[in-house]
Design a protein with these regions (language model features):
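Domain-level signal for soluble alpha/beta catalytic cores
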Residues: 1-148
């Protein structure tokens, strides 16, 4: 059972923006083109050390678990690579903060944050945590690869 992601404005930005050190910012346009309805554009930036602390998605999961009884509950979150893709690869004017002048430090902090994420969901009773990753499509498209 899932919550259908109905509490979210965006399938990916809401989770990532609530990580410590990450901020949601307004944007004039999306870095990808949507067909049909065009939601308000937004993006993310890394403003400080990336980490995992208090996060509203844990409460979302706990609520789902409380109403699901013995039914297995699935929680979905964006993969760690989505944070890097949005903040560093797709960002038109990406300038790393002082802490992340060496990209290895960013990768390390993202990895540690996600270890904490997975542990926190596990400790809350989550046994089905799905990491959604649409970044693979970026590398399968020859036109997208040219931009990197």
């Amino acid at each position: 059972m899932t919550d259908g992601e109905f509490r979210r404005r965006y399938w990916h930005l809401d989770f990532l923006a609530d990580l410590d050190g990450v901020e949601e910012i307004k944007s004039d346009h999306w870095s990808v083109h949507f067909k049909g309805h065009q939601p308000k554009a937004a993006t993310l930036k890394i403003a400080d050390k990336v980490d995992f602390g208090e996060h509203p998605f844990l409460e979302h999961f706990k609520y789902l678990k409380s109403v699901a009884g013995d039914t297995l509950c699935k929680m979905t979150i964006p993969s760690p690579s989505m944070l890097h893709l949005i903040c560093c690869v797709r960002a038109e004017e990406y300038i790393p903060i002082e802490r992340y002048q060496d990209m290895k430090d960013l990768y390390y902090d993202i990895a540690i944050a996600y270890q904490k994420v997975i542990r926190a969901f596990y400790d809350a009773g989550c046994r089905y945590l799905q990491l959604d990753d649409t970044s693979w499509g970026e590398f399968c498209d020859a036109e997208k690869r040219k931009t990197y």
